[in-house]
C-alpha cells in the first residue's frame, strides 16, 4: 500500500454516521493545558513540602529554646544555692568584703568616740579649773570688800562717838538741867494739889543726827562764836581747831541720787565708774565709785584701795568735786 492510500480517507459506508473531523491545533492546545495543569500541581506540592519543613523547623527551634531556658534556670539556681551555702559557712567573697568594710567603719567610729570623749574630758577639766580659780578670786575679793566695809563702818561709828563726845563737851553747860529757885509757901487748906510741870522733857541719852558731820561742826562753830566771852575757851573748842573750807562760802552744786545713780553737775554717775575726786585743799584723787546709797556714795581710791564716804551735802556745798575720767 502506498502512502497516498494510507493518508486518504476511507469512503463512507452507506447508512453510517459521518465521522468527526480532526484538527491538529486542538490537540496541541489540549496537550499544553495538561502540561500546565501538571506543572501547577507540582508547584503546589513543592509549596506544601516547604510549609511542612518550616513548621517542623519552628517546632524544633522552640524546643531548643525551652530546653536552653530550663538549663539556664537550673544553672542559676545551682549558683544561688552554692552562694547560700558559702554565705552560711562565711566563705562568700562578697560577704567577707562587706564584713571587712563594716569592721573598718566600726573601728573608725570607736576611735572617733574615744577621741571625742578625751576632748570633752579635757574641756570639762579646763572649765572646772577656770571656774575654781574664778570662785577663789571672787571669794577673796568679797572677803577683802567685807573687811573694808566693816572697817569703814567701825571708823564711822568711832567718828560719830568722837563727835558726840565733842558736842557734849561744847554744849555741856546747856545740857545740864539747873533747878529753878522757887519759894515754897505753905499750902492753904482750900488750895488744890499742885500738878507737877511736865513740859520739860529729859535730855535724850543718845543723839540722832539728821545732818552731816561737816554741817554739825559748822553749826557748833557758829554757836561758839555767839557764846559769852566770859566763858573760857577749852582746848577742844572750835577756835583751836584747824580751819576747814566749810568756813568760807562755797558754790552750790546740784546733786541727787535716783535709781541707784548719782546726778551731779548735770551728769549721771553709776557704780564702778572711774572718777577724779577733788577736795577744797586742791587735792585730786583717782577713785572708782564703789556703791551708791540713799544719801551718800562710797568711793575707792585706786592708789591704796581705801574707801571714803561722800555725802550729798558735801557735794552740794562744793566740799568735794567729782570729775569724769577714762576707765583705762
UniProtKB/Swiss-Prot annotation:
Subcellular location: Nucleus
Subunit structure: Interacts with HCFC1. Homodimer. Component of the SIN3 histone deacetylase (HDAC) corepressor complex. Interacts with SIN3A. Interaction with SIN3B enhances the interaction between SIN3B and HDAC1 to form a complex. Component of a mSin3A corepressor complex that contains SIN3A, SAP130, SUDS3/SAP45, ARID4B/SAP180, HDAC1 and HDAC2. Interacts with USP17L2; the interaction is direct. Interacts with FOXK2.
Chain positions covered by the region annotation Disordered: 1-65, 226-252
One Pfam match: Sds3
Biased composition (Basic and acidic residues): 56-65
Predominant localisation class: nucleus
Cellular compartments per GO CC: nucleoplasm; nucleus
Annotated coiled-coil segments of the chain: 66-171
Keywords on record: Acetylation, Apoptosis, Chromatin regulator, Coiled coil, Isopeptide bond, Nucleus, Phosphoprotein, Repressor, Transcription, Transcription regulation, Ubl conjugation
Phosphoserine PTM sites in chain numbering: 32, 45, 53, 228, 234, 237
Domain comment (free text): The C-terminus is involved in transcriptional repression by HDAC-independent mechanisms.
Name used for this protein in its record: Sin3 histone deacetylase corepressor complex component SDS3
Region Mediates interaction with USP17L2, residue ranges: 2-170
Function of the molecule: Regulatory protein which represses transcription and augments histone deacetylase activity of HDAC1. May have a potential role in tumor suppressor pathways through regulation of apoptosis. May function in the assembly and/or enzymatic activity of the mSin3A corepressor complex or in mediating interactions between the complex and other regulatory complexes.
UniProt organism field: Pongo abelii
InterPro entries the UniProt entry points to: Sds3
Family: Belongs to the SDS3 family.
Organism domain of life: Eukaryota
Amino acid at each position: 500500500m502506498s502512502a497516498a492510500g494510507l493518508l486518504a480517507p476511507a469512503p463512507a459506508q452507506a447508512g453510517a454516521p459521518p465521522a468527526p473531523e480532526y484538527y491538529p491545533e486542538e490537540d496541541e492546545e489540549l496537550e499544553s493545558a495538561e502540561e500546565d495543569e501538571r506543572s501547577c500541581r507540582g508547584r503546589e506540592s513543592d509549596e506544601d513540602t516547604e510549609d511542612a519543613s518550616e513548621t517542623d523547623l519552628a517546632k524544633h527551634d522552640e524546643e531548643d529554646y525551652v530546653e536552653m531556658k530550663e538549663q539556664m534556670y537550673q544553672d542559676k539556681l545551682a549558683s544561688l544555692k552554692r552562694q547560700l551555702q558559702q554565705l552560711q559557712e562565711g566563705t562568700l567573697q562578697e560577704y567577707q568584703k562587706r564584713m571587712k568594710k563594716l569592721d573598718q567603719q566600726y573601728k573608725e567610729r570607736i576611735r572617733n568616740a574615744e577621741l571625742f570623749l578625751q576632748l570633752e574630758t579635757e574641756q570639762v577639766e579646763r572649765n572646772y579649773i577656770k571656774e575654781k580659780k574664778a570662785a577663789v578670786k571672787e571669794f577673796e575679793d568679797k572677803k577683802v570688800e567685807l573687811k573694808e566695809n566693816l572697817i569703814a563702818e567701825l571708823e564711822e561709828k568711832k567718828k560719830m562717838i568722837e563727835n558726840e563726845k565733842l558736842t557734849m563737851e561744847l554744849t555741856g553747860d546747856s545740857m545740864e538741867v539747873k533747878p529753878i529757885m522757887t519759894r515754897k509757901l505753905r499750902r492753904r487748906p482750900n488750895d488744890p494739889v499742885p500738878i507737877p510741870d511736865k513740859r520739860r522733857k529729859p535730855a535724850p541719852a543718845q543723839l540722832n543726827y539728821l545732818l552731816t558731820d561737816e554741817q554739825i561742826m559748822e553749826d557748833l562753830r557758829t554757836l561758839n562764836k555767839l557764846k559769852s566771852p566770859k566763858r573760857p575757851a577749852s582746848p577742844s573748842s572750835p577756835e583751836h581747831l584747824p580751819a576747814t573750807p566749810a568756813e568760807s562760802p562755797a558754790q552750790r552744786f546740784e546733786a541727787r541720787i535716783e535709781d541707784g545713780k548719782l546726778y551731779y553737775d548735770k551728769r549721771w554717775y553709776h557704780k564702778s565708774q572711774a572718777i577724779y575726786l577733788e577736795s577744797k585743799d586742791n587735792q585730786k584723787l583717782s577713785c572708782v565709785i564703789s556703791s551708791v546709797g540713799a544719801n551718800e556714795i562710797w568711793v575707792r581710791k585706786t592708789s591704796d584701795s581705801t574707801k571714803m564716804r561722800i555725802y550729798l551735802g558735801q557735794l552740794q556745798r562744793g566740799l568735794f568735786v567729782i570729775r569724769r575720767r577714762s576707765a583705762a
